[in-house]
Amino acid sequence: MEIFTTTRGTSAGPEPAPGGHGGTDSPRTSDLSLRALTGCVLCILIVSTLLGNALVCAAVIKFRHLRSKVTNAFVISLAVSDLFVAVLVMPWRAVSEVAGVWLFGAFCDTWVAFDIMCSTASILHLCIISMDRYWAISSPFRYERRMTPRFGCVMIGVAWTLSVLISFIPVQLNWHARGRERTDPGDCNASLNRTYAISSSLISFYIPVLIMVGTYTRIFRIGRTQIRRISSLERAAPRATRGPALCDEESSLKTSFRRETKVLKTLSVIMGVFVFCWLPFFVLNCMVPFCRLEPAAAPCVSDTTFSVFVWFGWANSSLNPVIYAFNADFRKAFSTILGCSRYCRTSAVEAVDFSNELASYHHDTTLQKEASSRGNSRGGPYQFAL
């Protein structure tokens, strides 16, 4: 979400002096090399974002069963928002990074609105997915009754509506800027006023990240409790049959520890990637409007630094398909689309591992039967399938 930046000479360094011989050739060559390297890196990022999210959308279009699960609708809508980032936001900025100047004139305001809308929609969908997981794991039976397709569509609609409201309306009415009109067509500067910087950052990042931290913390606690209950039942079984209880108990404790570690690693990856990509940008986004600068003074944050953090945030859109759409159903669809089903085949146990089930929770027949049988064996519902 690039809501404070300028595209004049951001990543490629200062323009070389025109003309000249000898000593001016080396800076010019270095500048061109840096621009070429920047262009290659950004092209790779854009293409990977396009391919990853397009693959998710293609899988949903091709396979009807992926459209039948409400939780997959959130992953699909997330992929669409990230696809919009790759199409409506990244390419225009990449061209400007390489050229060192904004080349698209009056399109600047529309582009800024697209940037805010798409980035906010992506982050809000990550928040919705975390809430969906928490509800599914904490109250699975109530979740099955209440998480209907209609309710899922309402949640998706709220995310997109909120994203549009905080982007296009303020930008088109110029409520977001610091009170000066853009006069240079080669400068797409969207420096924010303090009110809009704080309010938009709260809606787009800080409130969603607090919700995600809360839901994933609760998920870890629920998972740890269920793992320990299962482990205690497994240790009790050999005692009932008078088997080698000591060895089985030690093995069960090791298994329980491995499961808890896997839960923690999975949740750490989900939250760690998101925070690593977006936190630096939003910290600067709230800090920069409070800088008091003289007209001729240097900015308190360099354009290059801000540009790097902006691209880190957008890079999250290339990682989301890997984190959120690699459950067993999607992986099978991907292997079929890519024509590698013979080589990508995995066993049933490997295909439905914990990290994938947690990354995109869904009930299938096998898991429901397993949950029912284990739940009946201890007189209660099995709430956390591994």
From Swiss-Prot:
InterPro entries linked: Dopamine_rcpt (IPR000929), GPCR_Rhodpsn (IPR000276), GPCR_Rhodpsn_7TM (IPR017452)
UniProt keyword terms in alphabetical order: Cell membrane, Cell projection, Disulfide bond, G-protein coupled receptor, Glycoprotein, Membrane, Receptor, Transducer, Transmembrane, Transmembrane helix
One example GO MF annotation: G protein-coupled receptor activity
Residues annotated as glycosylated: N189, N193
Any one Pfam family match given in the protein's UniProt record, by short name: 7tm_1
Topology, Cytoplasmic side: 57-72, 132-150, 221-266, 326-386
Location of this chain's protein in the cell: Cell membrane; Cell projection, Cilium membrane
GO biological process, one term: adenylate cyclase-activating adrenergic receptor signaling pathway
Keyword Kinase: no
One of the record's GO cellular component terms: ciliary membrane
Protein name: D(1)-like dopamine receptor
